[in-house]
A protein has these predicted regions:
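Cysteine-centered catalytic environments shared across enzyme families
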Residues: 1-280, 291
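Glycine-rich active-site loop/lid subdomains used to bind and stabilize high-energy intermediates
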Residues: 94-95, 154, 248-364
Length: 364
């Protein structure tokens, strides 16, 4: 990757980007019919794709990204976030100016007022909800929702949805048999693995005892049996809950090296304080602390990219629904006037099946 902001003299466009466009090689070949490329960077592909196709370039991008493109001639800013919001993108308006960043604290550093949202915190503590896709836990600070883009100039701000998850799901052709469904799923999984492992930096694997990461490890081993992968897994020393025995059994069938990352009560407390400072908003419990420790260990050892089962839990719908949890204990600890600020978001119901609406609630 090149230094950012990235400027393309041919198109007059400037880019800042966080993420990866997995099919950038294919897009480069297609765009070479119309442009001369001066580098081998993804950034140049993104800018020339936007110059050629405008907003519709997003439909051609296969990847995870948060991008901002400034057109010097038109004096307009275009921002977009990937289909499922893997990469964060926050923004705020102040005195007619638009501020944006991949972390909320960067907006505060730029002078945006730092004021917690009482309504959002009340909703979180009473209903265990993070609110609507555009909300944050800070007043007048917003996130661009997954699958949305934004146009901004000196006189207007226009936010639009470019990817509609429910329509994409409903347009998928249903396989005629279990065999066909299995073959199609494996084909898509293999394509995803090949794209993600095509990196110019050291790649490792984050392994738990779950079905998702175990499946991915098996798939990676089938595709790349002799690559020098380093596998990371965390444990706490509790034989009744640790998954380390399963990970060791899995890896006994491979040539991959296992790096075990231990968690102790002292480490958990230290990570909790650190992650609270980093995240700017509530995080998803103990697993976030464990992964933070695991990621920092991998980074110290020179492993820059870690593959894991992120996304497969959603595909297989194996998460519990937080709305089913008993909130009575928490509510009894809150003042009545604070609880009155809480509101349960009215989420969309695009599917006929209510189970589907609950399963994919965070994706639209």
């Amino acid at each position: 990757d090149s230094e950012q902001p990235y400027m393309d003299e041919d198109t007059g466009l400037i880019l800042v980007c966080d993420g990866n466009i997995y099919n950038h090689v294919e897009l480069r070949k297609l765009l070479s019919r119309y442009y001369t490329f001066h580098s081998d960077t993804e950034e140049e592909v993104i800018l020339k794709a936007y110059h050629r196709w405008g907003r519709s370039c997003l439909d051609r991008f296969n990847g995870i990204f948060a991008i901002a493109i400034y057109d010097r001639s038109a004096k307009t800013l275009f921002m977009a976030r990937d289909r499922f919001g893997v990469k964060p993108l926050y923004f705020a308006l102040q005195k007619g100016n638009l501020y944006f960043a991949s972390e909320i604290k960067a907006l505060f550093a730029a002078g945006i007022r730092k004021q917690m949202s009482s309504c959002r915190w009340a909703g979180y503590l009473v209903y265990s909800t993070y609110g609507m896709p555009y909300e944050t836990f800070w007043d007048e600070v917003y996130q661009l929702p997954a699958g949305y883009c934004l146009f901004f100039n000196s006189s207007s701000l226009d936010v639009r949805q470019w990817y509609e998850f429910d329509k994409a799901v409903q347009s998928v052709e249903i396989p005629e048999s279990e065999t066909e469904a299995t073959e199609r799923f494996l084909s898509l999984a293999e394509e995803s693995v090949r794209y993600n492992l095509d990196a110019a930096v050291p790649v490792g694997f984050n392994l738990s005892g779950g079905i998702d990461s175990s499946f991915l490890l098996g798939l990676i081993h089938r595709l790349f049996p002799h690559d020098p992968f380093k596998v990371y897994s965390y444990y706490g020393g509790d034989k009744f809950s640790d998954e380390i025995l399963w990970t060791e059994e899995m890896l006994s069938h491979t040539e991959y090296h296992l790096e075990q990352v231990q968690l102790t009560p002292d480490i958990v407390v230290k990570e909790a304080v650190k992650i609270a400072r980093v995240q700017d908003e509530p995080y998803d419990g103990f697993s976030s602390l464990a992964y933070a420790r695991l990621f920092s260990t991998a980074h110290r050892q020179g492993t820059t990219v870690l593959c894991d089962g992120l996304g497969l839990d959603e595909v297989w719908a194996s998460y519990p629904r937080k709305g089913d949890m008993d909130q009575s204990v928490i509510c009894s600890c809150l003042k009545s006037d604070f609880k009155e600020l809480a509101h349960l978001p009215e989420y969309p119901h695009p599917f006929r099946d209510e189970e589907d609406n609950l399963r994919y609630r965070d994706l639209f």
